[in-house]
UniProtKB/Swiss-Prot annotation:
It holds the Pfam family PPR. It comes from Arabidopsis thaliana (Mouse-ear cress). InterPro entries: DYW_dom (IPR032867), E_motif (IPR046848), Pentatricopeptide_rpt (IPR002885), PPR_At4g14850-like_plant (IPR046960), TPR-like_helical_dom_sf (IPR011990). This is Putative pentatricopeptide repeat-containing protein At3g13770, mitochondrial. PPR repeats lie at residues 51-85, 86-116, 117-151, 152-186, 187-217, 218-252, 253-287, 288-318, 319-353, 355-389, 392-422. One of its GO terms (cellular component) is mitochondrion. The gene is PCMP-H85. Residues 1-19 form a transit peptide. PANTHER family: DYW DOMAIN-CONTAINING PROTEIN, OS07G0578800 PROTEIN-RELATED. Belongs to the PPR family. PCMP-H subfamily. NCBIfam families: PPR. One of its GO terms (biological process) is RNA modification.
Length: 628
């Protein structure tokens, strides 16, 4: 707490003899004219004659200017003159301290209030929530309920924001019950906060039900449901919802567009992203950092790194998220040297400190860029405190991925053993994936079994272990793993690839027979296969994870979704037009080899984005250097 007594003494020891005005203006008029210091001097001269309107004007002026010391003088004057402020003025004091980030002082004002109203409680809850003190916000809400205070729509809208951060969905559902009980569920503020809470908790079905039941919708509620879909990776649903609401007359704001860009990034819809960018410019929306960061992320994930960098370079002020978006973009393209160069620039500028995400992007860039020793040095620097961020489990997982990607499986295994804490499923999963690529069966089997114990519901662990056994020809073990999956009702995420043509997404699954042009695609695939073999393509049968004969394996390889999408791209696009294909899982070795020879035979630039990174292929040469 500030030294009130010293300020009290200063308020009344200031000699007014040098203060001469021909006409003494009222304090409220001085404040409205921006003459705060004169108003404070007038307060000192009036002493105990100060009243409600003068204090109110002074507190509002101090609040507008975030003038902490001047506001403290006003508070000190109240105490010295034994003025007993009404609940309204005490609430203004609380809000003033909260806005000046003096939360302890704000809380003290609340605790000392003889009578509290809904505005007082809500102001304290709101400021705690806005500053990330979610537990404290919920504590104040609980005190409010115990003191028989009745929340209003603003209280509920504010406290719901804190539920997910601090206590998960359980408490949020209890508060939802109170909202229904007191008939606040139809209020637009409360409804928007409710659907935002459920969406952030992954309960998008409940969020959608709330959204559809709202008696009226504004841009906040519309943005909340779009953002909910985008945050959960339900990008198509987010895009459909945006188009629906736009057709219903919703006027998007910058937050809406930021959420839309997140969805377009996930779908890699570059043309749609460019259109959204044009809409933003045409509507002259505020170009806040959150929108610029979303644009950088969208262009990076859609493969247009040069434009992403241009946006980044032209930003008047960059946040940590801006730097991270650009670093992640370079990392996903395997451009490790560009990652390190940008990281050096960030540190040299000294305006924004690297955070945990920054270092994760840098380590990932080293991993994809074949710079293991550099990555290890940076990690050692993190441990030593050189970057102000200690390594977390994700950083350890990135080092395991880096060593495993380089084939240093034993070293990665030993690194895990030396971890200061128990390795998470993510860390072990990185090692299992590396064991599958480099056929390290013994370590992979041990890690895979352990992973299945840790997270028995994760289908990916079963699949990778099964694939490892299949690569080693251990078909009995493959069957055992698949039987285990059936017994536990664990289902694998189906692989799919997609390509955009004429503003439409065309999806393909393995051995797809559902596409409207399937007969044309399959006929073209047979023609392509002959030309590819003549050019030197040899199917990598080790990528078929079933115990069947070689002829059947070759047929299965030709049915992979990436190949079907490439074939459709060749049919649907004009000669020489680049073909861009996207896949939700990691591309297999055979499809990667196929795409390289495809680009050379048909003289097409091929861009493949899988779960991990981009592959830019020109004339048979891939940007990854066959290292991914």
């Amino acid at each position: 707490m500030f030294n009130l007594m010293r300020l009290i003494h200063r308020s009344f020891s200031s000699s007014p003899t040098n203060y001469v005005l021909q006409t003494i203006l009222p304090i409220s008029q001085l404040c409205s004219n921006g003459r705060l210091q004169e108003a404070l001097l007038e307060m000192a001269m009036l002493g105990p004659e100060m009243g409600f309107h003068g204090y109110d004007a002074l507190l509002n002026a101090c609040l507008d200017k975030r003038a902490l010391r001047d506001g403290q003088r006003v508070h000190a004057h109240m105490i010295k003159t034994r003025y007993l402020p009404a609940t309204y003025l005490r609430t203004r004091l609380l809000i003033f301290y909260g806005k000046c980030d003096c939360l302890e002082d704000a809380r003290k004002v609340l605790d000392e209030m003889p009578e509290k109203n809904v505005v007082s409680w809500t102001a304290m809850i709101s400021r705690y929530s806005q500053t990330g003190h979610s537990s404290e916000a919920l504590t104040v809400f609980a005190e409010m309920m115990r003191s028989d205070g009745k929340p209003n729509e603003f209280t509920f809208a504010t406290v719901l924001t804190s539920c997910i951060r601090a206590s998960g969905l359980g408490l949020g559902k209890q508060i939802h019950g109170l909202i229904v009980k007191w008939n606040y569920d139809s209020h637009i503020f409360v409804g928007s906060s409710l659907l935002d809470m459920y969406a952030k908790a992954g309960q998008i079905k409940e969020a959608r039900e709330i959204f559809e039941c709202l008696p009226e919708r504004d841009v906040v509620s519309c943005t909340a449901i779009i953002a909910g879909y985008a945050q959960l990776g339900l990008d198509e649903e987010a895009l459909e919802m945006f188009h629906r609401l736009h057709s219903e007359g919703m006027s998007p704001n910058y937050v809406t567009y930021a959420s839309l860009l997140t969805a377009l990034s996930g779908l890699a819809l570059l043309d749609h992203g460019k259109q959204a960018h044009c809409h933003v410019l045409r509507r002259e929306l505020p170009f806040y950092a959150v929108l610029q960061n979303s644009l950088i992320d969208m262009y990076s994930k859609c493969g247009n790194l040069s434009y992403a960098r241009r946006l980044f370079d032209n930003m008047p002020e960059r946040t940590a998220i801006s730097w991270n978006a650009m670093l992640v973009g370079y990392s996903k393209h395997g451009l490790g040297r560009e990652v390190l160069e940008l990281f050096r620039l960030m540190r040299d500028e000294k305006r924004v400190k690297p955070d945990a995400v920054t270092l994760l992007a840098v380590l990932s860039g080293c991993s994809h860029g074949r710079m293991e020793d550099t990555g290890l040095n940076i990690f050692d620097g993190m441990v030593a405190g050189e970057y102000g961020t200690k390594p977390g489990t994700e950083h350890y997982g990135c080092i395991v991925d880096m060593l495993g990607r380089a084939g240093r499986i034993d070293e990665a295994f030993e690194f895990i053993k030396r971890m200061p804490s128990k390795p998470t499923a993510g860390v072990l999963g990185s090692l299992l994936g590396a064991c599958r690529v480099h056929l390290s069966v013994d370590i992979g089997e041990s890690v895979g079994r352990r992973l299945i114990e840790i997270e028995p519901e994760n289908a990916g662990n079963y699949v990778i272990l099964s694939n490892l056994y299949a690569s080693a020809g251990r078909w009995a073990d493959v069957n055992n793993v698949r039987a285990m999956m059936m017994q536990k009702a664990v289902t694998k995420e189906p692989g799919r690839s997609w390509i955009q043509h004429e503003q439409t997404l065309h999806y393909f699954h393995a051995n797809d027979r559902t596409h409207p042009r399937r007969e044309e695609v399959l006929a073209k695939m047979k023609e392509i296969s002959i030309k590819m073999k003549q050019a030197g393509y040899v199917p990598d049968l080790s990528c078929v994870l079933y115990d069947v004969d070689e002829e059947q394996k070759e047929k299965m390889l030709l049915g992979h979704s990436e190949k079907l999408a490439l074939t459709f791209g060749l049919i649907a696009t004009g000669e020489g037009i680049p073909i861009r294909v996207f896949k939700n899982l990691r591309i297999c070795v055979d499809c990667h080899n196929f795409a390289k020879i495809f680009s050379k035979v048909f003289e097409r630039e091929v861009s493949l984005r899988d779960k991990n990174r981009f592959h830019q292929i020109v004339d048979g040469i891939c940007s990854c250097g066959d290292y991914w």
